[in-house]
Amino acid sequence: MGLLSILRKLKSTPDQEVRILLLGLDNGGKTTLLKQLASEDITHITPTQGFNIKSVQSQGFKLNVWDIGGQRKIRPYWRNYFENTDVLIYVIDSADRKRFEETGQELAELLDEEKLSGVPVLVFANKQDLLTAAPASEIAEGLNLHTIRDRVWQIQSCSALTGEGVQDGMNWVCKSVNAKRK
């Protein structure tokens, strides 16, 4: 067996671990999203007081997803989880327009963090099942996502409740990790 075939085999092993940081304001749907990814019951979800970790298999990767609470008093502790992050997933409640400015400020601060420099970002425009939800394009414009030049990014409409759009977002995550590791 040649070196190339050994490398190919290593590349296709399902145990490539990916560290994903799942952040966003409280009540954005982070935990619901995580439970949806893990195919768990989403009927009884309470605010996350610390963090949840789940491992999910996807496209030959073991995605270790760290879901950190989004309450204002918890946000200063987010930086304790930045180390070795492969992908940042930022969840936004698309129906809570009153908090768009606050969520934009938090995202901007995250993008300025040195330990997250160059880390791909997926923004989930969540709660698209609600009639009052802003479309992903409007959110992208409001957050000035088009000005991000130091990393790859994607905005994905989704509903963590129904699961719609969630897999599309995770497919992008896996593609980004693959591209980064080549």
UniProtKB/Swiss-Prot annotation:
Which SUPFAM superfamilies does the UniProt record give? P-loop containing nucleoside triphosphate hydrolases (SSF52540)
Q: How does it sit in the membrane?
A: Peripheral membrane protein
- Report any one BP term from Gene Ontology: cilium assembly
UniProt protein name = ADP-ribosylation factor-like protein 3
| UniProt record similarity statement | Belongs to the small GTPase superfamily. Arf family.
Q: Does the keyword Cell division apply?
A: yes
**UniProt binding sites for GTP:** 24-31, 67-71, 126-129
PANTHER family the UniProt entry points to: ADP-RIBOSYLATION FACTOR-LIKE PROTEIN 2-RELATED (PTHR45697)
One GO cellular component this record assigns the protein to is:
centrosome
Tell me the function of this protein: Small GTP-binding protein which cycles between an inactive GDP-bound and an active GTP-bound form, and the rate of cycling is regulated by guanine nucleotide exchange factors (GEF) and GTPase-activating proteins (GAP). Required for normal cytokinesis and cilia signaling. Required for targeting proteins to the ciliary membrane by releasing myristoylated protein from unc119 cargo adapters into the cilium.
The listed locations are: Golgi apparatus membrane; Cytoplasm, Cytoskeleton, Spindle; Nucleus; Cytoplasm, Cytoskeleton, Microtubule organizing center, Centrosome
Q: What one GO molecular function would you report for this record?
A: GTP binding
Gene behind this protein: arl3
